[in-house]
Amino acid sequence: MQKKIFGSLLIIFLGLKALGQTTGAENLGLVNWIDIKTAQELNKTNPKPILIDVYTDWCGWCKHMMKTTFSDQGLANYINTYFYPVRFNAETKDTVEFQEKKYANKNTGNRSPNDLAVI
């Protein structure tokens, strides 16, 4: 009898937990993020500094900044006006070209960084 009650409670708990989870959509704040290639192209015709937010999928502080710092309307307006804002995943496996130099992830182990995130 106790096993049935425990099993039922466990199923209810897991069901409620699943309902409370997000759909996987990431909160990207109010900043108009673009990729690094687009930022470099735009910079050729309208020069502005490129602001690179380096993040990882597992970084709690990165997510906190997205919810708070980059969701501040005043700061987002300032960044969108005076910078080309780029989000860069530090663990990307893609080779990235920035300022005519190529950066790669040498895949040195678990959670290995792309060289652009290390400079």
Residue ranges of model-derived segments:
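A short beta-strand-turn-helix
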Residues: 31-50, 79
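Thioredoxin-like thiol-disulfide oxidoreductase module
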Residues: 40, 73-119
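Short Cys/His-rich "knuckle" micro-motifs
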Residues: 70
